[in-house]
Structure formats: C-alpha cells, structure tokens
Amino acid sequence: MTPPASPSPGIRFENIDKRYGGLYALRQVSLEISAGECVALAGRNGSGKTTLLRIAARLVRPSAGSLTFPSTHQSGEPGRLQSGFVAHATMVYDELTAEENLTLFARLQGTTDVQTRVDTLLRDVGLSDRRSSLVRTFSRGMRQRVAIARALLQEPSVLLLDEPATGLDPHGASWLAGTLRRLCDAGCTILMSVHGESEISSLATRGIRLDTGRVVADTKAGASLQSILTFADA
C-alpha cells in the first residue's frame, strides 16, 4: 500500500453546529484529531457520526464553527487538503468496470499518470484479475474494495470512512482491517464511524462517542475505549 504523499495533518473541529431546519444534527462539537491517529466514532444511528464525517470531507458546511487542519496550516476550504472519503453506501458506478471506475475518478481528480496509479491500486486492493468485470457483478466486499481504491487515488493524508465494515463477510472484513492497519502504519490519519466492537474498530487507538449530536465520551484508555466500542449502539 502506497504511504501518504506528505505528512498527515491533524483535524480540528471547533464549536461545530449543524442544523437542518430546526433540528440539530451536531451541537458544539470541539475535537482535535492528531496527525496519524486512528479514531473510531461510535454512537446510535442518528447520533451525528455521518454528519461529522461529511463535514470533515467538506461535502457539507457546518451551520456554525470551523474546521481546520492545523499541522499544515490549512483551512477547511475545498481542494486544499488531500483527503479520501468512503461513504456508507459505496459510491461506485455499477455499469462500469472496476478499472473504468478508477480511471474516471482519477481523470476527474487530475491524477497524474492515470494508468500507473490505477494499475497500482487494483493490485493493492486485490482486484487486478477482475479489472474488466462490471461492478454490478461484485459482492459488497468487492464493491468496498473499489470504493477504497477510489478514495486512495490522490494518496490522501486523511481517510474518512462511514461504517466501512457494514455488509462485509469475514474475509472482506479481515482484508479491510489489514488495509487500514497498513495505512495507519504509514502515517495516514483515519477517522471512521463504527457499529460495535469488530476487527475494524479494534484498530482504533482512540474512541469518541456521540449522542444526539454531542460528544459524550472521548478516550484513549484501554478499558474505557473498549467500552465505547462495545456499547456503540446501546
């Protein structure tokens, strides 16, 4: 797996609010994710995990507060930080092949030496022999591999994942855990939402629990961290 192209920046959320009409999805969220940390977001459905990830990915704007990347002195403006986002619903095109999906997004993102990068990623995610297969014929786990390869096209310093293990069989979950472990070892900053304790969540060195849009727990300690992950949906 190719390591990040540059030292991975941390992420700082300062007093983040997100409203949809009169409903708060996030309220007064202040967090700092250190460079190279692997952080798990836990909580019930609707607790704000996906909204926080989408703000970090700059797909939505907060209603109040700020998002910054302090270790590189970059603001949260689009295009100023290489980050990859893997959504809960895999964002790939069913009627294209695995190779065509990656080639399309590589060109849209301005990737240099597109064919070499696509070849490398197909090999890294174990899909070289299925490069010419239509994605609609893939299992959930194989689709997830395409989505992760897409997120890694720009060699991101930050990887954001929304429930990446959902629907994966044990083999797919084991592959994903190994991939994320290699990225962590290479210095990539990872922020991911999880449901309960799993091989994926066990990679986390820090756990943050959200409830009704607020941070209610944040720990790196062993027993406390496992408690957050084990009872993520309680």
Where are these regions (language model features)?
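Conserved catalytic motifs of ABC-family nucleotide-binding domains
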Residues: 155
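The feature captures the beta-strand-to-loop junction immediately N-terminal to the Walker
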Residues: 42-44
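Catalytic Walker B motif of ABC-type/P-loop ATPase nucleotide-binding domains
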Residues: 159-162
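Helix-to-loop junction immediately C-terminal to a conserved catalytic motif
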Residues: 57
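H-loop/switch region of ABC-family ATPase nucleotide-binding domains
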Residues: 193-195
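Conserved ABC ATPase "signature" region
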Residues: 103, 107, 113-130
